[in-house]
């Protein structure tokens, strides 16, 4: 029996609990009042759509600048926040997630084409949730909430009500350990090809 199986047997004898996304954290939107995105002389730095879409974990280096009205009225990002694409040309590219694992500077904002969730500490490890949000099971449930004809977007109320597994923290941490190892090995093998 694997360590993960032992933890599940010990800590979840009646099965893993499921909760709606809105129950496990605070959902927030990207910046508003943008007057000039990609402005070298902007008044704020932000995490852009491509950064979230392309990476399992956000790259916090060399972030672009934007100019926005009322920068003090914006949701400021923190380490542990999970970011999602809110719209795309295809349904499969909506709600692609990425987590901020690295220490992030104060005052960094979120692109207006993204939204995020801040997982409450009592519900666990943001990296676990990010791996789940990238899973095939979750992607299938997300696709049922996507709307559109030529441009597709995620329905926020439907997204917030999606049920996700919330195992105890030791189970989450073991899952993250396994998946981080797998991700690292995959990257090494890919680099050697």
Question: How does the language model describe each region?
Answer:
Residues 28, 87, 91, 183-186, ...:
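A generic secondary-structure signal for well-formed alpha-helical elements
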Residues 8-31:
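Non-catalytic DNA-recognition/assembly elements of restriction-modification systems
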Residues 7, 113, 178-181:
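Short, hydrophobic/aromatic alpha-helical segments in well-folded domains
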Residues 1-11, 82:
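Accessory (non-catalytic) regions of SAM-dependent nucleic-acid methyltransferases
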Residues 15-19, 129, 160-191:
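Amphipathic alpha-helical segments
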Residues 25-163:
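DNA target-recognition domains and sequence-specific DNA-contacting regions of bacterial/archaeal
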